[in-house]
Amino acid sequence: TAKTEQDLIRRYREIALHPECDMAIEDIVNEAITSNENKQSVKVVTDQLQYSSKIKQTIEQEFSEVLRMLQFNTRGHDLFRRWYVDGRIFFQKVIDAENPKNGITELKYLDPRKIKKIREVRKRRPEGMVSPTNINIADETVEYFVYNERGIQGSAAIQGIKIAPDTIAYC
């Protein structure tokens, strides 16, 4: 049995190498991601949104830009397969520090074995309260990602680079 997410991903990838599994995965990916020069494989549907047509058009344009950054026309099959086998996919949203108004300039794929979301609950003892049980109250929750090029090992004392949650896109 797998003890960590990284062990699970490794196991999933091993299973995907078996010819029968590989063929089944290919069938699923081919059904999900179709290649057609005249039509996109995926699109955002805004018909039921309660917004103006201008906002809907902006959403559609931004979605097309994300597909362009992902090179979805050429890499869509591979991206979907990675997500399907690993059960998750991560991208770092890169923004030009000198000109942040330009928005996201690049989406970098991150190996899911090398990144982990951390939810740290910071607790405090209520002021003026003396209790034999030493009750602590959850004061705030801090979320961030930890990235380690060598991979995330175990769950205790995770070492690596802390990354703000708003710079990572994942599912």
Positions of the model-derived regions?
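General N-terminal leader/first-domain-start detector
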Residues: 1-65
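Structured, contiguous alpha/beta core segments that scaffold functional sites
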Residues: 1-30, 70-171
